[in-house]
Structures are given as C-alpha cells and as structure tokens.
Amino acid sequence: MQGQNQQQAYDRGITIFSPDGRLYQVEYAREAVKRGTASIGVRTPEGVVLVVDKQTRSPLLEGSSVEKLHKIDDHVGAASAGHVADARQLVDFARQQSQVERVRYDEPIGVRTLTKSVTDHIQQYTQVGGARPFGVALLIAGVEGGEPRLFETDPSGTSNEWKAVAIGSNRGDIQEFLEDEYDAGLSVDDGIDLALRALNEGREDALSGDGVGVGIVDADTGTYRELAADESQSYIDDIEDAADDSDDDDDEE
C-alpha cells in the first residue's frame, strides 16, 4: 500500500522524479500523442511532405474542421498528433515567434531556431507546478537556406531532426515501413506516395482525399501549401491503380 501511495505522489507531482528517474505526467502526455491519429513527414531534396490522417469519429463530422495541418509562416508548416487544443496553443506560439523574428531582423526565422523556441516553451511545462505538459507532438517542416528541414517535437521538450518520421497512432508499423521504403533521392511526388502508402499500413478502411491532409514545403520556392482534397485523391488513385496492376501481374505468374 505504501508503494502505491508513493507512485500516486509521483503521478500528481509534475516536478517530482520517481526513484527510477521518470516523470509520469510527461509519459502520460506521450500516451495522449499515441491516441491521436497519425501524422507523417518525409524529407526529399525537392522539399518536405506532411501527410495527416483526418479520420473522423462520425460520418456527420465535417472533415475540414479537423485541424492537423498548420501554416506557421510562408516557409514553414506543421502537422500534429494528440490533443487538438494543445496543438493550437503551440502553433499560435510558433506563429508569434516567427513574426517576432521578421519584425526584429527583417528575415524569416530559421526552422531549427523556431523548433528550439517551441521545445523550450514545451519544456517549461515539465518543470512548473500547477501546470501540465502539452499532450501533443508536432512535425515542423520548412526550408532554411534552400535546404529542406524536418523536426519532431516531444511532450518532454526534446526535438529530433528526421529524414522520415511518424507520430501518433500506429507509429511503430508506419515507422518500420518508412525505414524499409525511404530513399534519399525521392521527389516530392514520390514522398507523397510513400507517406500515403505508409499511412495505409494497418488500416481497415480505405484512404480518401477527404480523409487525409497533405502539405508541401517546396525547396525551390521556399513556400508551404496544402493540397485540395481532389489533388490528394489523385495520388490515392495512382497508388490503388499501381496495387491493382501488381495483383494482376501476380495472377499471371
């Protein structure tokens, strides 16, 4: 009973480490991320692709109301997994930091600098009593000095730079697929194809243009844009056609 009471004390105290060096509230925040639908980032020489699962809980819910892709600045976009309201708070903070940089230095903020500002903000909420960690992870994609960059943030306030990465539900299977299929020479179109096929891993229902979101940061223009549902659907159709052709070839053999 005493051991159980001690664990409950560590659970309640965000600033208290357990004897084995764990912050339980941060770990619970990571679990909240795992409960969110998946988001995937793929970096290519031509730019960075963000693909998100906008799967809804009800057929009556408008897919356009599901906010998982976010424009931070002209050259930076983000994808989220976890608590939507927490993501909105971090996105607003990132936008403010980006605008401060433009006003102060008259130039766009660096992607690494922006990510560090966001993770520093996140980390503060793991040290202050009376607050809780953010139950969300972000993929921050952008162009810096003509080079595509892709970062992941964690509820602990750490960040990592990736070539390809997934956050949210089914991360393990999706990440394994990305590791097997990723190639450093991918085009943006190939990156979209890879991310959509990875998102399809382990799904019971079929992908649709309304059920996914696709964002692209173009390395040449240094701009972020999001695809319309019909554009996303055309990529999904190409994937399905390629799968059908492969099945036909197998039948002939």
From Swiss-Prot:
Protein name, as recorded: Proteasome subunit alpha
Positions of region (Disordered): 229-253
InterPro entries in the cross-refs: Ntn_hydrolases_N (IPR029055), Proteasome_alpha (IPR050115), Proteasome_alpha-type (IPR023332), Proteasome_asu_arc (IPR019982), Proteasome_asu_N (IPR000426), Proteasome_sua/b (IPR001353)
Family from the record: Belongs to the peptidase T1A family.
Domain of life of the native organism: Archaea
Broad class of the protein's primary localization: cytoplasm
Species of the source: Halobacterium salinarum (strain ATCC 29341 / DSM 671 / R1)
This protein's record includes keyword Cytoplasm: yes
Assembly: The 20S proteasome core is composed of 14 alpha and 14 beta subunits that assemble into four stacked heptameric rings, resulting in a barrel-shaped structure. The two inner rings, each composed of seven catalytic beta subunits, are sandwiched by two outer rings, each composed of seven alpha subunits. The catalytic chamber with the active sites is on the inside of the barrel. Has a gated structure, the ends of the cylinder being occluded by the N-termini of the alpha-subunits. Is capped at one or both ends by the proteasome regulatory ATPase, PAN.
Alphabetized GO MF terms: threonine-type endopeptidase activity
Activity regulation behaviour: The formation of the proteasomal ATPase PAN-20S proteasome complex, via the docking of the C-termini of PAN into the intersubunit pockets in the alpha-rings, triggers opening of the gate for substrate entry. Interconversion between the open-gate and close-gate conformations leads to a dynamic regulation of the 20S proteasome proteolysis activity.
